[in-house]
């Protein structure tokens, strides 16, 4: 008889403990009901990136002096700089400049150390493609400025994200 009573007491204690845990979880769930939704309907809603966002690199061909500083400071030696030495003026002439964004880690060293400021980071972050070879941008593709998200009337921009309010 005594083991049966202790068994019922253990069962009762376990039931109360389980009810307490369920109540705690329910209270956490209720505390989240008055928060803004975190989910963003991506193609139709886009977050405005911060001022220091590291997006696609923009390249200005006319400013580049082919010094290859960007290649030396890149942790993966990514930018490909082809140049030719002009013997009559003893100066380098840039022939081709390309970056493969499938490999780029967007560290920003090339932009930071460029002596002529011919490289800059843009707010563009959409690189979705079916072929990875399309991510290899030459100087013509790097020279195009991305369309601003703010100016696109088909996209609803979200200025204040719930994540930035909490942090």
UniProtKB/Swiss-Prot annotation:
One of its GO terms (cellular component) is chloroplast thylakoid membrane. It is a peripheral membrane protein. This is NAD(P)H-quinone oxidoreductase subunit I, chloroplastic. Binds 2 [4Fe-4S] clusters per subunit. It is an enzyme of class 7 (translocase). NDH is composed of at least 16 different subunits, 5 of which are encoded in the nucleus. Its cofactor is [4Fe-4S] cluster. It comes from Arabis hirsuta. InterPro entries: 4Fe4S_Fe-S-bd, 4Fe4S_Fe_S_CS, NADH_quinone_OxRdtase_chainI, NDHI. HAMAP family: NDH1_NuoI. It holds the Pfam family Fer4_9. It catalyses: a plastoquinone + NADH + (n+1) H(+)(in) = a plastoquinol + NAD(+) + n H(+)(out); a plastoquinone + NADPH + (n+1) H(+)(in) = a plastoquinol + NADP(+) + n H(+)(out). Its main location: plastid. It is found in: Plastid, Chloroplast thylakoid membrane. One of its GO terms (biological process) is photosynthesis, light reaction.
């Amino acid at each position: 008889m005594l083991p049966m009573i202790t068994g019922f007491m253990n069962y009762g204690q376990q039931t109360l403990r389980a009810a307490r845990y369920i109540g705690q979880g329910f209270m956490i769930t209720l505390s989240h009901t008055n928060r803004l939704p975190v989910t963003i309907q991506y193609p139709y809603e886009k977050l405005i990136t911060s001022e220091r966002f590291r997006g696609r690199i923009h390249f200005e061909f006319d400013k580049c002096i082919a010094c290859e500083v960007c290649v030396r400071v890149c942790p993966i030696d990514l930018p490909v700089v082809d140049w030719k030495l002009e013997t009559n003026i003893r100066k380098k002439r840039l022939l081709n400049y390309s970056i493969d964004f499938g490999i780029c880690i967007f560290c920003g060293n090339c932009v930071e150390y460029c002596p002529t400021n011919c490289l800059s980071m843009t707010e563009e972050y959409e690189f979705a493609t079916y072929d990875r070879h399309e991510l290899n941008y030459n100087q013509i593709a790097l020279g195009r400025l991305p369309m601003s998200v703010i100016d696109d009337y088909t996209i609803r921009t979200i200025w204040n994200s719930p994540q930035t309010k909490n942090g």
